[in-house]
Amino acid sequence: MSFEMSREQYASLYGPTTGDAIRLADTELFARIEKDLTAPGEEAVFGGGKVVRDGMGQNGRLGRDEDVPDLVITNVVVIDWTGICKADVAVRDGHIMRIGKAGNPHVMDGVDIVIGVATDVIAGEGKILTAGGIDSHIHFISPDQIETALVSGITTMIGGGTGPSESTKATTITPGAWNIHNMLRSFEQFPMNFGLLGKGHGSSVPAMAEQITAGAIGLKIHEDWGATPSSINTSLQVADEYDVQVAIHTDTLNEAGFVEDTRAAIAGRVIHTFHTEGAGGGHAPDIIELAQDPNILPASTNPTLPYTRNTLEEHLDMLMVCHHLNPGIPEDVAFADSRIRKETIAAEDVLQDMGIFSMTSSDSQAMGRVGEVVLRTWQVADSMKRQRGPLPEDEGTGGDNHRIRRYIAKYTINPATAHGISHAVGSVEEGKFADLVLWEPRFFGVKPDLILKGGQMVHGVMGDPNASIPTPQPRWYRRAFGAYGTAVAASSITFLSRAAIRAGVPETLGLRKVVRECRDIRTLTKADMKLNGETPPLRVDPQTYEVRVDGTPVTCEPQHVLPMAQRYFLF
């Protein structure tokens, strides 16, 4: 016997379905559901008088060893670079077990996820599920960054540093085995995945390679240590030998060479360019031109994203502090001024929107905000839709799915791919580590509802602990059980090089966290940057700083009002 109800009534009970669209926060972005893997009339819903009860939606005969998940997130909308769908998402042993239809196959049709005695349930009706974000430009200055990043939806942090030293405030580098080992020990306490970058400065391959054997998953080249052709070449020699990544902040002052000299030193080898627009550092004024090369994996950092009326004004003081410059020295002020170019900053949002820039990241506490990678990525997407209209791929579809998939890839799968960890994290796909973020649509990209690490709940919005129910005010972010005790070791990954794992670093340091290797990096090209692999000719005019893409000028207007801003925050 069939039963009909309106789409509105169905969505209020079970969440939206195929053809429905969800507005993301207060933006002009609409996610249209492409397919629904659940079955109408057979939805698995938990609660009093609902479906997931023994002998109904739950199979009470099957034990955990009989292909039963540990957790099911029911009827949730999955937004991922792979697509936008509605499904039940099953987690087992800390990994995504299956994306499909949950329930009891004895009484329900189409079930490929069997809810059993061992299964917990999170209600995903009316909510959005994404992969945990990956911030690949972290200055490890303060450990307080970690929780700030986590509650913004970031579950993996890659970068370098040792604390509030002057070099860490300026450069994302953890130099040498002793510092690397101490940072790896410290990371054991936090429900976050980590990867470290060693110092990419030296003329000796063995001296730099020992950092990889010690546990770094790559090397970082930074102009404050000297971004010379020699350092670039030596770092890439190490990277090619050990299958790790090199990240680079190029030479703003053009002291050791111009952008053409850096390109020659790179010599076609894959490299991850940080803040490729240049305000965060890099050859002035034309570092952008590297983004046309097929071996360059270009990223932006978030202080210039999106372009607003305040962007230029805040950058000078920010830059002086971060790079240990003296405002009383004219040469230091000139150095800072050379980075801050309205024309290239105005082009940056457009290059992101066109898929020419592939990633976003923070540059945490060093000209970037660690808790705003997700937020600012979506603000750029909204700004570009308002100024440039729908992407050609979205014309006539009733949604913005291609643009949404492009932008979510910028802080999930693409940084994971660039650093050789996409086999473990970076997307909502079966077999991957269950780093998942649950959002209410009205708070999407701004304030997550619940953060899962390795399938464990580690943080989320919770009400007064003394209340009789979980929801009374004040509601704020509180740690969950997965963030305490030895559960942290099972909920999070420490990424190491293959050489470090073979050298026994986890055993030597007594690491308890899950250890995974970085791999398959040196064969990457920009074509591997999902939905963000465009390589058109780029040119920056050396006099006017105008940016041209395939001969056409690109720019945008500074925004005066943004979504996902004062409507959601007091400060």
From Swiss-Prot:
<comment type="pathway">
    <text>Nitrogen metabolism; urea degradation; CO(2) and NH(3) from urea (urease route): step 1/1.</text>
</comment>
<feature type="domain" description="Urease">
    <location>
        <begin position="132"/>
        <end position="571"/>
    </location>
</feature>
<dbReference type="InterPro" id="IPR017951">
    <property type="entry name" value="Urease_asu_c"/>
</dbReference>
<feature type="binding site">
    <location>
        <position position="363"/>
    </location>
    <ligand>
        <name>Ni(2+) 1</name>
    </ligand>
</feature>
<dbReference type="GO" id="GO:0016151">
    <property type="term" value="F:nickel cation binding"/>
</dbReference>
<dbReference type="InterPro" id="IPR032466">
    <property type="entry name" value="Metal_Hydrolase"/>
</dbReference>
<dbReference type="Pfam" id="PF00449">
    <property type="entry name" value="Urease_alpha"/>
</dbReference>
<keyword id="KW-0378">Hydrolase</keyword>
<dbReference type="GO" id="GO:0009039">
    <property type="term" value="F:urease activity"/>
</dbReference>
<dbReference type="GO" id="GO:0043419">
    <property type="term" value="P:urea catabolic process"/>
</dbReference>
<dbReference type="GO" id="GO:0005737">
    <property type="term" value="C:cytoplasm"/>
</dbReference>
<protein>
    <recommendedName>
        <fullName>Urease subunit alpha</fullName>
        <ecNumber>3.5.1.5</ecNumber>
    </recommendedName>
</protein>
<dbReference type="Pfam" id="PF01979">
    <property type="entry name" value="Amidohydro_1"/>
</dbReference>
<dbReference type="InterPro" id="IPR029754">
    <property type="entry name" value="Urease_Ni-bd"/>
</dbReference>
<feature type="binding site">
    <location>
        <position position="275"/>
    </location>
    <ligand>
        <name>Ni(2+) 2</name>
    </ligand>
</feature>
<feature type="active site" description="Proton donor">
    <location>
        <position position="323"/>
    </location>
</feature>
<dbReference type="InterPro" id="IPR005848">
    <property type="entry name" value="Urease_asu"/>
</dbReference>
<keyword id="KW-0963">Cytoplasm</keyword>
<dbReference type="InterPro" id="IPR011612">
    <property type="entry name" value="Urease_alpha_N_dom"/>
</dbReference>
<dbReference type="InterPro" id="IPR017950">
    <property type="entry name" value="Urease_AS"/>
</dbReference>
<comment type="similarity">
    <text>Belongs to the metallo-dependent hydrolases superfamily. Urease alpha subunit family.</text>
</comment>
<feature type="binding site" description="via carbamate group">
    <location>
        <position position="220"/>
    </location>
    <ligand>
        <name>Ni(2+) 2</name>
    </ligand>
</feature>
<comment type="subunit">
    <text>Heterotrimer of UreA (gamma), UreB (beta) and UreC (alpha) subunits. Three heterotrimers associate to form the active enzyme.</text>
</comment>
<dbReference type="InterPro" id="IPR050112">
    <property type="entry name" value="Urease_alpha_subunit"/>
</dbReference>
<feature type="binding site">
    <location>
        <position position="139"/>
    </location>
    <ligand>
        <name>Ni(2+) 1</name>
    </ligand>
</feature>
<feature type="binding site">
    <location>
        <position position="249"/>
    </location>
    <ligand>
        <name>Ni(2+) 2</name>
    </ligand>
</feature>
<keyword id="KW-0533">Nickel</keyword>
<keyword id="KW-0479">Metal-binding</keyword>
<feature type="binding site" description="via carbamate group">
    <location>
        <position position="220"/>
    </location>
    <ligand>
        <name>Ni(2+) 1</name>
    </ligand>
</feature>
<feature type="binding site">
    <location>
        <position position="137"/>
    </location>
    <ligand>
        <name>Ni(2+) 1</name>
    </ligand>
</feature>
<feature type="modified residue" description="N6-carboxylysine">
    <location>
        <position position="220"/>
    </location>
</feature>
<feature type="binding site">
    <location>
        <position position="222"/>
    </location>
    <ligand>
        <name>substrate</name>
    </ligand>
</feature>
<dbReference type="InterPro" id="IPR011059">
    <property type="entry name" value="Metal-dep_hydrolase_composite"/>
</dbReference>
<dbReference type="InterPro" id="IPR006680">
    <property type="entry name" value="Amidohydro-rel"/>
</dbReference>
